A protein has these predicted regions:
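Hydrophobic transmembrane alpha-helices and immediately adjacent juxtamembrane helices
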Residues: 1-265
Length: 265
């Protein structure tokens, strides 16, 4: 574990160098919240409630989603992994007793610590300005379930990015795969609109996909869009997806290394 802790420390140092990049992202997220305020304000102009929730609850949901992206979201980990494979940097991990997944997850964790910490500053500003509009439920169980839900969400998001990065073993360019993944994740992950506004059949189907658990599920727990029995059942589904994606990541790594060695990597 010491080597992965060292990787975490190195990741913290390197990400602090790029802290202004994260700060700009945080500032852009504030701009997005302004657009959300305007667009959803117009949507609620003709109705006091949509999908069973009022404007204040919807605004709170989007603020929580924007915040969680900086704490558990994958930014460019897929491209970083792809670059290491293309440049042959992956070879150094084949000669050392280091688990590449654990190493990259340590770097991912470091990046989220830095980005999440920087997000707290604009978040405090937004909360100060919109505190009269924010409606977070006070039930203690939401925090108790929210923490493991966020942990599994981070693992799922990283695992998906990791798998896309490993596709470089077969494809020289993965940008098309990543763009497609981002489009699906934004839609089925609840970043564009709360998923419970979808038709009932589509919403039910989305609950069995991993994208649902990337952002919507933890945000729905924290903002009161799920009751406790539903949250507990979906926590089991989220855990299952985390295990499945870990298995897929392991399979891609094993098969990818065989191909890498076969072509003289």
């Amino acid at each position: 574990m010491t080597k992965y802790y060292q990787a975490l420390l190195v990741g913290l140092q390197s990400n602090l160098v790029y802290r202004w990049n994260f700060a700009v992202r945080a500032g852009f997220s504030l701009f997005q919240l302004v657009l959300v305020f305007i667009l959803w304000g117009a949507a609620f102009a003709g109705s006091s409630r949509l999908g069973g929730f009022d404007f204040d609850q919807t605004l709170t949901y989007f603020l929580v989603v924007a915040t969680l992206q900086f704490f558990v979201g994958a930014f460019n980990e897929d491209y970083q992994i792809s670059e290491e494979i293309r440049n042959g940097l992956i070879n150094q991990f084949l000669l050392k007793p280091i688990n590449y997944f654990a190493y990259r997850f340590s770097i991912f964790t470091a990046a989220r610590i830095v980005s999440g910490s920087l997000m707290l500053i604009p978040l405090a500003l937004v909360v100060a300005l919109l505190h009269h509009k924010l409606t977070l439920p006070a039930e203690a169980w939401r925090f108790v379930l929210g923490v493991p839900a966020l942990t599994l969400s981070a693992l799922i998001q990283f695992s998906i990015a990791y798998c896309f990065g490993l596709l470089t073993f077969w494809f020289l360019e993965i940008q098309g795969f990543v763009i497609l993944s981002m489009a699906i994740e934004s839609t089925l992950g609840g970043q564009i609109f709360p998923l419970d506004l979808m038709p009932a059949g589509l919403f039910h189907a989305a609950r069995f996909l991993p994208f649902y658990y990337q952002m919507y599920f933890p945000a729905a727990i924290l903002t009161g869009r799920l009751d406790r029995p539903t949250a507990l059942w979906e926590m089991a589904v989220e855990l299952a997806w985390a295990a499945i994606l870990l298995g897929v990541a392991r399979l891609l790594w094993t098969r990818g290394l065989r191909r890498h060695t076969a072509v003289g990597g």
